């Protein structure tokens, strides 16, 4: 079984909630699945450039010859995603949405003809049988009962993007309010770890 582990926090693991949680998810899955092969992609330590026609994966219909090194890397990112059985994404909320580093990764993964296709009846996702677990951190509270509910564009964006390519039910583990005092931070992290511990393979 292959697992792809992505992190997009600009903070180091000892101070990043999303990195800590994504690492906990990977460790938990590894304990339950000893034959697991893990590929790690740190999107901050090794960022992908923003999307251009010249660095799209060659499989993308809009791709044109350009930076062949980046095109090859983009193709490798796509294949890495497609061959993984499980994808674990560590994603903090930055300014109400996902980090740009994670957006650049998604731009390599949402590829017409490979992960989705258009047809007379609309869009059809082509990614089947893949499990995605998102470890998400938010500094404040963005639930439906809060004044900031409409400002939540991290979980909603990821659910939309993943659903678009056929991953209709990603598992999202949220540590919320982690910037609202030490007690709240500790409680949110503990609750998230309990959710991680309940994951089944």
UniProtKB/Swiss-Prot annotation:
Entry's EC annotation: 1.6.5.-, 1.7.1.17
Cystine pairs: none
Top enzyme class: oxidoreductase
Keyword match Manganese: no
Pfam family, one: Flavodoxin_2
Keyword Signal: no
InterPro entries per record: Flavodoxin_fold, Flavoprotein-like_sf, FMN-dep_NADH:Q_OxRdtase_AzoR1, NADH:quinone_OxRdtase_FMN_depd
Cofactor field: FMN
Binding positions for FMN per the UniProt entry: 9, 16-18, 93-96
Catalytic activity: 2 a quinone + NADH + H(+) = 2 a 1,4-benzosemiquinone + NAD(+); N,N-dimethyl-1,4-phenylenediamine + anthranilate + 2 NAD(+) = 2-(4-dimethylaminophenyl)diazenylbenzoate + 2 NADH + 2 H(+)
Keywords assigned: Flavoprotein, FMN, NAD, Oxidoreductase
MF terms (GO), sorted A to Z: electron transfer activity; FMN binding; oxidoreductase activity, acting on NAD(P)H as acceptor; oxidoreductase activity, acting on NAD(P)H, quinone or similar compound as acceptor
Cofactor binding: number and manner: Binds 1 FMN per subunit.
Binding partners and assembly: Homodimer.
Functional summary from the UniProt entry: Quinone reductase that provides resistance to thiol-specific stress caused by electrophilic quinones.
Protein family (similarity comment): Belongs to the azoreductase type 1 family.
Protein name: FMN-dependent NADH:quinone oxidoreductase
Lineage: Bacteria, Pseudomonadati, Pseudomonadota, Alphaproteobacteria, Acetobacterales
Gene that encodes it: azoR
């Amino acid at each position: 079984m292959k697992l792809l582990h992505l992190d997009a926090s600009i903070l180091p693991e000892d101070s990043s909630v999303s990195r800590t949680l994504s690492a906990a998810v990977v460790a938990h899955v590894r304990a339950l699945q000893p034959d697991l092969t893990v590929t790690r992609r740190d999107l901050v330590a090794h960022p992908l450039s923003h999307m251009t026609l010249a660095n799209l994966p060659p499989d993308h219909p809009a791709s044109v010859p350009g930076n062949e090194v980046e095109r090859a890397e983009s193709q490798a990112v796509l294949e890495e995603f497609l061959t993984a059985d499980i994808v674990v994404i560590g994603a903090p909320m930055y300014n109400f949405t996902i980090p740009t580093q994670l957006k650049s990764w998604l731009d390599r993964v949402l590829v017409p003809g490979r992960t989705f296709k258009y047809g007379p009846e609309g869009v059809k996702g082509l990614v089947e049988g893949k499990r995605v677990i998102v470890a998400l951190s938010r500094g404040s509270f963005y639930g439906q009962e809060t004044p900031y509910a409409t400002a939540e564009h991290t979980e909603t964006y990821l659910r939309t993007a993943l659903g678009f390519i056929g991953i209709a039910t990603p598992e999202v583990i949220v540590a919320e309010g982690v910037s609202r005092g030490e007690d709240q931070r500790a409680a949110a992290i503990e609750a998230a770890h309990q959710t991680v511990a309940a994951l089944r393979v």
